[in-house]
Amino acid sequence: SAVCLAVICGNSEVEQQAAMLGQPAENWRNPFFAESLPALCQQWRPDLLYIPSSPSGGVMPFQVDAGIAHYFGVGAYLRTPDDARLSGVRFTSECLGFANMPEDSLLDRMHGNGDSPGAHPSWKQGVPRDHGTAWDFEDVRDHYLTQIYQTDAMRLRYADRERYLALTRRVTGQLMEQTLQTWRRAGSACHGALIWFWKDLREGAGWGVVDAHGQPKAAYYYLKRSMATQAAFLTDEGLNGLACHVVNDSAQTMRGTLTLRLLRLPSSTTAEVSLPLELAAHSKWQQRADALLPYFMDTAYAYRFGPVSHQVAALHWQAEGDSAPAAAGFAFPAGHVLPAESHAS
């Protein structure tokens, strides 16, 4: 494959830094990025899009609902997953930077069998942090682990190493997947997102979704599912219940069967419904789960009139002629701590 040049960007965060330091708007963009560089681009590559600075375009350069954004609301700014929808992101050239935990094979290579990641300086060298901050991106990840799994991340790290590692790998992938699904759903104003970033520059729990040696981390597989050309997923619409989504970004019409299941663990199916679905190329389909079910089942567990009837909602898309689902999405109405796991938290 060949490298293709599509966009030329003048700089990264120059306008943002000037604005955050309190400079007036006339000082955010200097003549080189405002006049000289775009003139050169027009002369030599008039076919390309020129962006003076990333981020830029809003009332403030770092405003995320206009122009080009850097979105770390879900992430460094510790906002809840709902912020991805509230912020109205239109396009983000950087987003969802987390300290993604590598696989055990790399941990063993780094520290010897059985040694746990923690506060040791040699481990922290591989954990990203912003200059001048009192926290790093491992603190960010542990914040969400505590919030989503209702456990004390610090205590868990020392008391149950295996569970801590499993949840740290899972939580960053889940946050990325949920955010991207929010942006891909029908009605979203978002037209694209670039993850920060692909590959770690050194061994450790870096921003990369693959480690420094090219081995995918858990987050990579969550992204693979949520960014697939053909995707099926569920979103929580509050008192309106769960919504079912199917996205077809391929050049071909999708034909097949969509199946929604509500599952009560460990082994009961409380509801199951299937329907034929045909979806044109480059299109989206959305329907409320309540419209597919025969009666009200509080799919998002928003009304809470009694005990939760299902811990997992599963949506599967199976293409015509295939024996296995081509896409799947899941929701956890009662939270991510499932009955079989609750003893360990």
What feature does the model see in each segment?
Residues 2-63, 171-174, 213-214, 218:
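Active-site neighborhood of glycoside hydrolase catalytic domains
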Residues 6-7, 43-54, 61, 191-192, ...:
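Acidic/polar loop patches that form or flank catalytic/metal-binding clefts of enzymes
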Residues 39-42, 78-246, 250-252:
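Substrate-binding clefts and catalytic carboxylate motifs of secreted carbohydrate-active enzymes
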Residues 241, 253-259, 312:
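Exposed beta-strand and adjacent loop surfaces of beta-rich binding modules
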Residues 246-248, 262, 317-319:
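Hydrophobic beta-strand positions in extracellular immunoglobulin-like domains
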Residues 249-256, 268:
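A short beta-turn/strand-edge loop motif at beta-sheet boundaries
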Residues 256, 292-344:
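Terminal connector regions
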Residues 259-306:
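Intrinsically disordered, low-complexity Pro/Gly/Ser/Thr-rich segments with frequent PxxP/GP/PP motifs
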